């Protein structure tokens, strides 16, 4: 699909009818001002929990991972982050983790969720922490899974950042999407699971075409471009975070260094608890959903 000229990531609705991709979870939509939307799927019953995915993903990542186990205890609302999946955001706006937290909060309010637990993975975990710093009195707690917490040069800056440039970015995206992306993106998706392997269920049922289309990669580039200033702001504010926070990290994560991010953040955030999952990689919510559920249950109100 070509890059959308004015909004990201692309189509405003999943395809319906016989041609619909069966891997795409049916969405509902919250309409926000300025032609923004938050797409979401809901399952389970109990206290409210909002699940936020990470980079190169859409809500199916959470849906295929910890959501089924969480739904036994919570009403889970899994969202497409702004500019990802089927959630629309204006081109060049709203990529900052703080802006994304605000947009998700707008959707939470419109849905009438009651003091939800905010659960995020990777980039989504950074959004969950920002959400807690912005709106501490509105949530029950934070579950931060494999969080990226501090500014650093990351692979996303190099691979995707240039595609978000206002001059030449769209052309570069089209060229790379047709040439290198078909080989590059599967390598990245598989590497996320190391040292484990991608589960067969994920391989068969995750909508890779949705998460890897050109417009979403442009959104990834915008996200990466705002990561340094946004995480600098976060790092300065972690000591003021006054929401019950559970940080979980994989002991063998090669995507986000657990010891430079989650471990340090847990020391800075008052009262935060840290759990290291031995031998687990970045995608441990898929291989160890029980630790995610345990952390969420500890915040249940």
Predicted regions and their residues:
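Flexible "cap/lid" loop of the alpha/beta hydrolase fold
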Residues: 133, 142-175
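Acidic catalytic loop of the alpha/beta-hydrolase fold
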Residues: 228, 252-256, 282-283
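Conserved HGGG/HGGXW glycine-rich cap/lid loop of the alpha/beta-hydrolase fold
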Residues: 36, 41-86
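Short beta-strand/loop motif that positions the catalytic acidic residue
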Residues: 241, 247-249
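Conserved alpha/beta-hydrolase catalytic His-Asp/Glu region
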Residues: 153-156, 177-239
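Short alpha-helix in the alpha/beta-hydrolase fold that links the catalytic acid
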Residues: 234-235, 243, 258-265
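Catalytic active-site module of serine/aspartate enzymes centered on a nucleophile-bearing elbow/loop
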Residues: 270-301
């Amino acid at each position: 699909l070509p890059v959308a000229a004015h909004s990201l990531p692309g189509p405003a609705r999943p395809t319906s009818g016989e041609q619909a991709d069966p891997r795409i979870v049916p969405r509902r939509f919250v309409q926000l001002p300025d032609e923004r939307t938050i797409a979401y799927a809901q399952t389970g019953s109990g206290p409210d929990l909002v699940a936020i995915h990470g980079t190169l993903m859409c809500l199916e990542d959470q849906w295929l991972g910890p959501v089924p186990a969480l739904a036994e205890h919570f009403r889970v609302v899994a969202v497409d982050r702004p500019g990802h999946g089927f959630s629309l955001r204006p081109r060049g706006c709203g990529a900052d983790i703080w802006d994304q937290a605000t947009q998700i909060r707008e959707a939470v309010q419109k849905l009438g969720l009651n003091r939800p637990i905010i659960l995020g993975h990777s980039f989504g975990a950074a959004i969950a922490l920002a959400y807690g710093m912005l709106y501490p009195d509105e949530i029950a707690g934070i579950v931060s899974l494999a969080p990226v917490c501090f500014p650093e040069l990351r692979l996303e800056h190099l691979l995707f950042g240039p595609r978000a440039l206002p001059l030449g970015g769209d052309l570069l995206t089209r060229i790379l999407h047709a040439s290198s992306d078909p080989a590059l993106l599967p390598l990245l998706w598989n590497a996320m699971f190391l040292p484990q392997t991608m589960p067969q269920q994920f391989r068969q049922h995750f909508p890779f075409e949705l998460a890897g289309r050109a417009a979403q990669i442009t959104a990834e580039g915008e996200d990466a471009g705002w990561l340094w200033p946004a995480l600098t702001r976060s790092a300065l504010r972690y000591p003021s975070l006054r929401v019950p926070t559970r940080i979980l990290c994989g002991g063998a994560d090669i995507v986000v260094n657990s010891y430079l991010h989650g471990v340090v953040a847990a020391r800075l955030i008052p009262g935060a608890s840290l759990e290291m999952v031995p031998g687990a990689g970045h995608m441990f919510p898929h291989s160890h959903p029980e630790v995610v559920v345990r952390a969420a249950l500890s915040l249940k109100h």
